[in-house]
Amino acid sequence: MIASRRLACVLALATVLFAAFTSPALAQTPAPILQEPQTIPLWQAGAPGALGKADEDTPTLTIYMPPSTTGPMTAVIIAPGGSYRALSMNKEGRLPANFLNTLGIAAFVLKYRLGPKYHHPIELGDIQRAIRTVRARAAEWHIDPARIGVLGFSAGGHLASTASTHFDAGDAMAGDPIDRAGSRPDFAILGYPVITLTEAWTHQGSKTNLLGENADPALARNLSTDTQITANTPPTFLFHTNADTTVPVENSIYYFLALRKAGVPAEMHIFKDGAHGAGMPMQDPALSEWPKVLANWLRAGGFLK
């Protein structure tokens, strides 16, 4: 009964999203039936550095597949926000996943470990493992291993930007085949992200939860991701609001400028109004535009086939 109600909610949401993101003619077409999401642990035998076996100690991926899974599809790993202390799994996880499904994109919502129990590099290790997992199992899931992106909101945006600036090609000699896969995302989508951990416009709560009360200044600089961008940083789409008083828009602006300086393809949209944590604001006349322009960016960049 619970599963039936859950599926009914997913189908109802899919109907709304499908109507919102198609032409009037296509809006009359019945919404596609989305598959029931499945959740898997990132590590079968327990996560490295785990301090217990509770839910909070077990990073997972919840898999949302679009109706057609013939592939090869684009995939996006979603990192919800929550100041590195909680996770907005609905507004910044499930709803974006459902939207991506309407574009034919496979979505994977990441439940990563959080402060104050866990600090860096645990969170980075979790998202890197997620990227490796999707890439290593790309054939099984009908995914193009060269079209795997990350989407992060707020603190999850910081984590996605960290994955975009701190990655490796994998360990070819690893016994675990997942560890042989590279952790570089092919593109990044950052929604009102925390970027700096050193400037006045940082989000102090996210910084403290990630690094602890007495953060090493050198580590804070290394994880201020606008200072870590190179020509190999993946193409990036950013959106923010000028009215955001929780995570000031300077975070996105300085990241964009660093991408531009490095010659990395990037697009940024700054909306005049809107509070922090918008997620998928389908009823907001202004902010409801960001998923539409994101879809255009994905197509223009060749990330949608």
At which residue positions do the language-model features occur?
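Active-site glycine-rich loops that stabilize anionic/oxyanionic intermediates
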Residues: 80-85, 242
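Catalytic nucleophile-loop/oxyanion-hole region of alpha/beta-hydrolase
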Residues: 88-90, 94-95, 108-145, 282-289
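C-terminal catalytic histidine-bearing segment of alpha/beta-hydrolase fold enzymes
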Residues: 64, 239, 249-305
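Primarily recognizes the serine-hydrolase "nucleophile elbow" in alpha/beta-hydrolase
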Residues: 129-206, 220, 225
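Short beta-strand element of the alpha/beta-hydrolase
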Residues: 72-81
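Short beta-strand/loop motif that positions the catalytic acidic residue
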Residues: 238-240, 244
